[in-house]
Amino acid sequence: MIPNQGILGGHVIDLAGVSNNSTTLSVGGDMTQTQVVEVYTATWCINCVDTEHALMDALEGEDATVLVHHRFIGESQDPFGTQAGDDRWIALYGPTSQANTPPINVERSAPSVVFDGHRFVAGSAPNGDSLESDYAGMFADKHDYRSWNGVESDFTWIGDNSSGTVSWKFDVHPNEPSGMEWNHRLMVVEHSAYFPEGGNDLEYYEDVVRAVIDLDATLQDNGNEWGGEQQIDLPAAWDGDDLSLVVVHEWSIPIVESDTSEESRLPGFLAPLGLFALGAAALARRD
């Protein structure tokens, strides 16, 4: 579990068959139901196949947006990953991945699954009776911030399946913790990509994240919402016509390290005098 971060959002706009560059598509609403589930994988990863099948069985009938990220850095066998995708994964999940993959301690471990951007698990060995039951339990254990009733996320796409303009907004919760920081991103997802050369023989790779795009954000409506608008060029689909767009909102709360030393407990200018006094007392005791 990652205590100081998570993800809201997950609304999807399907661009399949959208060829008119003036097409307008919108989606949005309350974010408390949809859960973002992220997977880290590679086309050569054999044990990833079992974990992904178990995950999809666990999510059957659930309101989940699945984002499957493929390896890119140092990768020669998997064609689907991106630099931006790996950079984001390392920034969000790298330290937790290292802590959960001894003794190799890698920042990008395939397979890994993350629920809500908050609950992380690496590897293919179940902790309980089965991987499916593990994943079902992690999905059900949603973060409290997904219970923020009335917090909505909306976005609109004007364009076709190759380029367009995305505009979006996201409510600021009146009771969000002090110091909470947000990053907003657009994910371009391909529903299914055929790659028979994959070393794990899966051939069809589902929900592939083809691009990760940072969204510029400004506070709007007197500070009541975040929002923005920008022109986007989309990557070409690997095959077919099955791209979709997903907007996610990543929150984090900086961890402030508490200083419990003797010096930190002394106010301001008294600290040096206090340390001097402590030193004098120590000398007196030695005498």
PLM-predicted stretches and their roles:
Residues V114-H118:
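Short strand-turn-strand beta-turns centered on an Asx-Gly dipeptide
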